[in-house]
């Protein structure tokens, strides 16, 4: 059976969740992923809910009893994969002549194995005198 737009789009998002889950050694309640793609600039971030609290990726070892590899190398590897996945989504949107989101907000609930996704299609930062640098 041939893949369709939705399959390829979701496959890239699933990879984003997978790499973030791997980064935290499958030990999170929720994973939050943010990506922005405007005017050829792609940015992103990811953070976690662990033990009922929100933690940035570089602060995970502040969690009592936890010891993660939060090295710059590991964070960079995860970020590279996230941004490559956004580029894959760009290619999928182009292939299927679909609009490309300018902003992704993904929340993955580990226990429920469910993904809540919110997309914006208008520029959020470009040309905004306050939000852009």
Indicate where each model-derived feature is located.
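Contiguous interface-forming segments/domains that mediate binding rather than catalysis
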Residues: 1-103, 107-133
